[in-house]
């Protein structure tokens, strides 16, 4: 019974950590505040593309707490008496560390650093979620939406 409950708890905890919305880093996704907003358009050419990782902003709370709780439960099933309490503490600490690292990895997105030479000669760098159309587009024209947050799309 304990093994079934622990397996179910692990499944729930680690499936929740994968719920980070990584589409917000895509060039095709706009925030609610950007909807119905006039944005300037600038044309340019992709000069280079470099693969990068984008780390979503998260505090690691779900992974740390979930991992700590599950590690504590798993540790408490070991031994008896004082040894059981020590195993529970060690399990909780180990689980918290592991849960935090798992959540961190699950909230990373493959991105692309795009160096773009605008038609006016100025060069800018934009980082957004990787798109397969950027991989082979060095020297192709692109559309750049203006403002403090840019979205790059291939024409």
Swiss-Prot record:
It is found in: Cell outer membrane. InterPro entries: Bact_OM_lipoprot/Surf_antigen, Gly_zipper_2TM_dom. Its main location: membrane. Keywords: Cell outer membrane, Lipoprotein, Membrane, Palmitate, Signal. It is a lipid-anchor. GO terms for cellular component: cell outer membrane. Residues 1-18 form the signal peptide. A lipid is attached at residue 19 (S-diacylglycerol cysteine). A lipid is attached at residue 19 (N-palmitoyl cysteine). Belongs to the Pcp/SlyB lipoprotein family. This is Outer membrane lipoprotein pcp. The lineage of its organism: Bacteria, Pseudomonadati, Pseudomonadota, Gammaproteobacteria, Pasteurellales. The gene is pcp.
